[in-house]
Amino acid sequence: MKTRDQFTALFESIDFEKIIDHPNILIAANFWDNERYCAARTCYRFMRALDDLIDNHKAAHQGISMDDRESFTSEIRHWMGMLDRQMNKSPFNNELGYTVERFRIPLWSLEYFAESMLYDVIHDGFATLDDFIEYSIGASVAPASIFVHLAGLQEHDGVYLDPPFDVRRTAEPCAMFSYFVHIIRDFRKDQLNNLSYFADDVMTRHGLTRTAMSEMAHGAPLTPGFRAMMREYLDIADCYRADTLIIMDEICPKMEPRYRLSLEIIFELY
C-alpha cells in the first residue's frame, strides 16, 4: 500500500508535457490566449494525475486491493482539499486554487470528477449501462465542462465573467459522444490493461461475459454478439453526435472565433 508521500512523489514526477494518450483538450486549447490555455493545462494536470494513478495501478495489479482502496480514497479526498489555497502550501496546490478562483471554474465539475474516480476505486466495472452513463458525468462531462467553460468565458477589463450559456448542457452531448467513441476505439487496449467500460447488462443481452471479452481482446475470434454490442454502442454514440450538432449551432454565435474553433476541433478529432 502506497503512503501519501509516495503518491505525492509520483504525482510530482509526472511530465505533463509528454502526455500523448489523450491530448485532445490541450490540442484544441492551443488556439486560446495563453492565460486560458494555462488554466486548462492546470485543471487537466489535476484530473490526469488522479486518473493515471488509478488506471496504472489497475493495469499493474489487476485491480485494487481493499487496503489500496482505502489509500486511494484518502488521496482523492486530500486532493479535493487542494481547492482551499489557505490550507495548502505547495506551489501546485496554490496554482489550482488560483485557477479555480480566477477563471470561475465551477466546483461541481471537479467534485463530480473526483466522485467518478472514487467509483473507479470502489467498483470493478459497471453492472448496468445506466451506471456507466452516471459515471461518465464525472469522468467525461466534468472535464469537458471545464473546457467549455474556459472557452465560453467573457472577459471585460481583465475580469472573467461566466459564459452566456449553460456549460453542462453544452458539454454533455459532445463529451458523451467522445467517451463512447473512446471506449469502442480502445476496447483492446483497455482490456489488456485490466480496464472494462462495457456494462454487464449489455454484455449479457448479447451473450457475452467479461471472460469472453478478455479472450477476444487477446486474439480470440470476434463473435456475432460482440459485433452486435458494438453496433448498439455506436448507435448510442451517434445519438449524442446528433445532439452535439444541435448544441453547436446554438452556442457558436455566442463565442469568439478562436474559442468556437477549439470546440469544433474537439468534435472533429473524434
Segment roles from a protein language model:
Residues 1-178, 189-270:
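Catalytic cores of Mg2+-dependent Asp-rich isoprenoid enzymes
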